[in-house]
Amino acid sequence: MKEKIRTLQGRVTSNKMNKSAVVAIERFVKHPIYGKFVKKTTKLHIHDEKNECSIGDLIEIRESRPISKTKSWILVKILEKNIF
């Protein structure tokens, strides 16, 4: 049975590294006691081979083999460019 490839969408928060970027993934989680939905943010380091993403871009990433100590996600495509 084949495993499903994990893909996520997020905003680029930093691209100061060469061929790398930091992406913030936002998700809503229900509080176990109060029932309110709370926004949680996860930061992931991604591999950007062509240095094409910039801060504020909405991008799609997929999981891959470990590329370095902290990078195990690869840029698939840029969904929306930042206009600023």
UniProtKB/Swiss-Prot annotation:
SUPFAM superfamilies: Nucleic acid-binding proteins. One of its GO terms (cellular component) is cytosolic small ribosomal subunit. It holds the Pfam family Ribosomal_S17. Gene3D superfamilies: Nucleic acid-binding proteins. GO terms for biological process: translation. CDD domains: Ribosomal_uS17 (cd00364). Keywords: Ribonucleoprotein, Ribosomal protein, RNA-binding, rRNA-binding. It comes from the Bacteria. InterPro entries: NA-bd_OB-fold (IPR012340), Ribosomal_uS17 (IPR000266), Ribosomal_uS17_bact/chlr (IPR019984), Ribosomal_uS17_CS (IPR019979). One of its GO terms (molecular function) is structural constituent of ribosome. One of the primary rRNA binding proteins, it binds specifically to the 5'-end of 16S ribosomal RNA. Part of the 30S ribosomal subunit. Belongs to the universal ribosomal protein uS17 family. NCBIfam families: PRK05610.1, uS17_bact. This is Small ribosomal subunit protein uS17. The gene is rpsQ.
